[in-house]
Amino acid sequence: MKFQYKEVHPFEYRKKEGEKIRKKYPDRVPLIVEKAPKARVPDLDRRKYLVPSDLTDGQFYLLIRKRIHLRPEDALFFFVNNTIPPTSATMGQLYEDSHEEDDFLYVAYSNESVYGK
């Protein structure tokens, strides 16, 4: 997926910002969260998040559901590197496994369980 944040901000800017955040908040994970293409769910009010590294994917899922005002019966899926992460994984584990060279972890969300549909 092409993240709009990457399109708008050059790599050098993102890298500098990511390093600054990680240095200032070593126990937190910097995230870029964007809606997947063709997803039929509301947009988030912001893209950048700084979450505790011990927050689970499941807890973050609930936070995002609340921010986009999804009804209980509406589906929501996260993708990290085009795969759905386990809800028991901590954001710190996901960050260590999947963060990009700019020191951000990129997360896409969608109402479909198949990436890009």
Swiss-Prot record:
Membrane-topology annotation of the record: Lipid-anchor
GO function terms (MF aspect): GABA receptor binding; phosphatidylethanolamine binding; ubiquitin protein ligase binding
Region span, Interaction with beta-tubulin: 1-22
Domain of life per record: Eukaryota
Keyword set, alphabetical order: Autophagy, Cytoplasm, Cytoplasmic vesicle, Cytoskeleton, Lipoprotein, Membrane, Microtubule
Post-translational modification: The precursor molecule is cleaved by ATG4B to form the cytosolic form, GABARAPL3-I. This is activated by APG7L/ATG7, transferred to ATG3 and conjugated to phospholipid to form the membrane-bound form, GABARAPL3-II. ATG4B also mediates the delipidation required for GABARAPL1 recycling when autophagosomes fuse with lysosomes.
Tagged with keyword Repeat: no
Prodomain positions: 117
GO biological process, one term: autophagosome assembly
Alphabetical list of Gene3D superfamilies matching this protein: Phosphatidylinositol 3-kinase Catalytic Subunit, Chain A, domain 1
Site (Cleavage): 116-117
Tissue specificity as recorded in UniProt: Ubiquitous. Expressed at very high levels in the brain, heart, peripheral blood leukocytes, liver, kidney, placenta and skeletal muscle. Expressed at very low levels in thymus and small intestine.
A Pfam cross-reference name: ATG8
Presence of keyword Coiled coil: no
Record-level GO cellular component terms: autophagosome membrane; cytoplasmic vesicle; microtubule
Function comment: Ubiquitin-like modifier involved in autophagosome formation. Whereas LC3s are involved in elongation of the phagophore membrane, the GABARAP/GATE-16 subfamily is essential for a later stage in autophagosome maturation.
The family this protein is said to belong to: Belongs to the ATG8 family.
Protein name: Gamma-aminobutyric acid receptor-associated protein-like 3
Originating organism: Homo sapiens
Origin organism lineage: Eukaryota, Metazoa, Chordata, Craniata, Vertebrata
Gene name, Swiss-Prot/TrEMBL: GABARAPL3
